[in-house]
Amino acid sequence: MGVMKRYMQFVKPYKKQIFVTVLIGIVKFSIPLALPLLLKYVVDDIIQGGGTASDKTTSLFTIMAIMFALFLILRPPVEYYRQYFAQWTASKVLYDIRAKLFDHIQKLSLRFYANTRTGEVISRVINDVEQTKDFVITGLMNIWLDMLTILIVISIMLTLDVKLTLISIVLFPLYGISVKYFYGRLRKLTRERSQALAQVQGHLHERIQGMPVIRSFAIEDHEQAQFNEKNGHFLDKAIRHTNWNAKTFAVVNTITDLAPLIVIACAGYFVINGPLTVGTMVAFVGYIDRMYNPVRRLINSSTTLTQSIASMDRVFEFIDEPYELTDKPNAIKADQIRGGVEFQNVSFQYEKDKENILHDVSLKVNRGETVALVGMSGGGKSTLVSLIPRFYDVTSGRLLIDGTDIRDYEARSLRNQVGMVLQDTFLFSETIRENIAIGKPDATLEEIIEAAKAANAHEFIMSFPEGYETRVGERGVKLSGGQKQRISIARVFLKNPPLLILDEATSALDLESEHYIQEAMDKLAKDRTTFVVAHRLSTITHADKIVVMENGTIIEIGTHDELMDYESQYKHLFTIQNLN
């Protein structure tokens, strides 16, 4: 019941629309309830009543004309508005939930995404949220209408014959027993099926992104076997769910089909041996159908609601994923950052109870300085710079910006003061203009063009027929590595932050692209505090400080000339690269 109560918080803003939908539904379901009474009247009062054949025919066509008019005038608009309001309300609720989830997604730590498959996150936001739609339409609307229909039908039947009415509802307790027995396990099976589907989606999403690797290594058969294993696991869970669901329907529908047989037998006996009229018997059989159809729908609704609640469990399990990084209640805005950065005895680990990646790192960087971080792969360079925009909090020690611990700043305002150009540039499948504007969403086209020119990107952008409106494809697949990198640099020019991080931004590029990008980065770094993670040491000889890292610690600090004056690790690396 806890998840249903939480779900109702999303439904609450639309309670008026739900109330109107239920009222319209009452009218919709009430209209057909007149048909058995009409049938009784036709049988008892017209067909078996007194009068000539002509009088009976006139009475029959008169009453039928009235009923035709009633159905033609009322039924279409009632049916339309009930369906429209029900679907509109459910869609709005799902819109709000997905908006909440996306807001939540943007606040989760990078550690969460490192440990969670993208496809599984997508499954929660799309599939599981969609499954909860039935709770709104079925649980909050149809169930009440079906229950009200049953009560109205029983009330009408009681006016016709009390004894036969009691016989009609004698099987009701069996429904309650069936629901209690079947639906507890059904919720568990539904949850397992949803989890298996999320695994398939996660696997599929990853393989689609890695299709060039699959093709280049010719491992299609291996990957097909891997997918078949995941898909087979989902199939197994789906069949187990279907098997249990089928048992539920078998029992429920058998009970539903027995009820009319019992009523027909008893009603026939009462007509033969008692005062019950043929018309009343016919009406009763008609009402049995109108009573047990809602009962059947209620049981089916239990299945639907069980599946919806299982999906709610997964949705709220995701919403309850804690934030690793939260702002202090009195956090200050980082609007006036000057650019001084200091690491004070900083240690860091990605996972608790795991070995530290950084060990007691201390480093002071003055405003406007360019600091290069060099060393062998795995030394902790990228980890160190990832602490500056507070993607992670330090495990111990302090990281200060302008003398203030970064945990005292609002994280979002702090990140707004940091520009990053990474080796693996991510572009969205939108236009070049929109991708550059990520640096400043409200930027004018003129500002975007100026940023592109500064990044040496304007010329190649204008070589495309659609210029800045060229769509770059998923992850920028239509652009070369150098072109994507220049778009990334243009973003930072547009953002114009006081702090800059360049993480291996020129690695794996051809010489021409590297020349354009290095020139753009030199312009970008001017008058900014800049951290450069580099493997090509020839690109950072101008740095104010060169920091050599090894196994998560700083082993050397100095300028290029200072470090080349003795047998330093830096000199060793620089000499090897120049020899190559």
Swiss-Prot record:
Keywords: ATP-binding, Cell membrane, Membrane, Nucleotide-binding, Translocase, Transmembrane, Transmembrane helix, Transport
Domain of life: Bacteria
Homology family: Belongs to the ABC transporter superfamily.
Protein name: Putative multidrug export ATP-binding/permease protein YgaD
Gene name per UniProt: ygaD
A single GO cellular-component term on record: plasma membrane
EC supergroup of this enzyme: translocase
This protein's record includes keyword Oxidoreductase: no
Membrane topology, from the record: Multi-pass membrane protein
